Amino acid sequence: MLLAGSIFVLTLILAIWQPRGLSIGWSASICAALALVSGVIHVGDIPVVWNIVWNATATFIAVIIISLLLDESGFFEWAALHVSRWGNGRGRLLFTWIVLLGAAVAALFANDGAALILTPIVIAMLLALGFSKRTTLAFVMAAGFIADTASLPLIVSNLVNIVSADFFRLGFTEYASVMLPVDIAAIAATLGMLHLFFRRDIPATYDVSLLKMPASAIKDPATFRAGWIVLVLLLVGFFVLEPLGIPVSAIAAVGTVVLFAVAKKGHAINTGKVLRGAPWQIVVFSLGMYLVVYGLRNAGLTEYLSGVLNMLADKGLLAATFGTGFLTAFLSSVMNNMPTVLVGALSIDGSTASGVIKEAMIYANVIGCDLGPKITPIGSLATLLWLHVLSQKNMTISWGYYFRTGIIMTLPVLFVTLAALALRLSVTL
């Protein structure tokens, strides 16, 4: 256990701090090779882990490429300018609409896309409105927070969701039927906490006339229009074709190819830049990191956690839901959500839980791994990248401020979300 744990910690350190520019793919690969050479994992574990990650990472990359193409076309800026006008000059209403826009983008384009794409747009828009740095920080923190807390409803809304759904063979419709109502509760709780926490930083009014016209944001009309069609067809495809056995990644890939072809033909978007900006490293990172995590499983960590989950399962639905959710949220905050979701899945699979109790644990693991990363900056790689993007915009957020905000905001939202899950599953008892 000590050797497997040491290799895992080394993987996290290299991935988070990236010494001398070492990419996350290389760091995970080096540590996976170390785990293999040291006997922590075996050659036979490689195809097992690949079977866990291939569909998830392929889907994630396809969704991110679609979001990057739409961003280049002006899609998200157009949407942000529209919702800003819906605020009608009232600061609190503007804050609400920005948060709801973030929730919608997170649901359709994954949490990473929501945080990284919306943040620069929101900053530019708030600067145009003449908002103070403190007010801008409130809006930016809100956009970053909702990106994760609202990434529950669909399998494609978060890489964590895809990994878990693949592991337990959850269908797209089956997953959405449980998590859509849970996500609504999460959004409502998040919106309430954000308004409460930042109540002194939200201006009473703003001048709508300072905003650009939404139409002026559209840089590639053809890709912009095609984007709407692709999004509708993707959602239909996910719900209709996935139950027929077609992988979510294949459906997403078709949508990506269609939108990419439209953008390529129009010449207004630098499609080469978009491809270079796609997170290709996540494929290598996921395989390498999960091989290292599999080493923890081989060393007995998941067996120990399975015992903890068995105790929770014996106490009923509420204990299983809240216990699993808070446990994986804590683990995500200290050891990153990507490895935690697999550790959680392996532990649940190894437990004696069954029926609705096991179902509650599966979804609570997803909730914990989606929301838990908001407690600390190291909870997800996307958060670290988001903080880096902010620093480039002269908005430095200290780890202390992030942790203080994160723990105050996350725990109540996590509680409400897990309660909503328990209520949703109790309906099917």
UniProtKB/Swiss-Prot annotation:
Compartment list: Cell inner membrane
Transmembrane region(s): 21-41, 46-66, 98-118, 136-156, 178-198, 228-248, 249-269, 274-294, 316-336, 337-357, 371-391, 407-427
GO molecular function: antimonite secondary active transmembrane transporter activity; arsenite secondary active transmembrane transporter activity
Membrane topology type: Multi-pass membrane protein
Signal peptide per UniProt: none
Cellular component terms (Gene Ontology): plasma membrane
CDD domains per UniProt: ArsB_permease
Keywords: Arsenical resistance, Cell inner membrane, Cell membrane, Membrane, Plasmid, Transmembrane, Transmembrane helix, Transport, Transposable element
Pfam families hit by this protein: ArsB
UniProt cross-references to InterPro entries, sorted A to Z: Arsenical_pump_ArsB (IPR000802)
NCBIfam families per UniProt: 2a45 (TIGR00935), PRK15445.1 (NF011980)
PANTHER family assigned: TRANSPORTER ARSB-RELATED
Protein purpose: Involved in arsenical resistance. Thought to form the channel of an arsenite pump.
Family statement drawn from the similarity comment of this UniProt entry: Belongs to the ArsB family.
UniProt protein name: Arsenical pump membrane protein
Species the sequence originates in: Yersinia enterocolitica
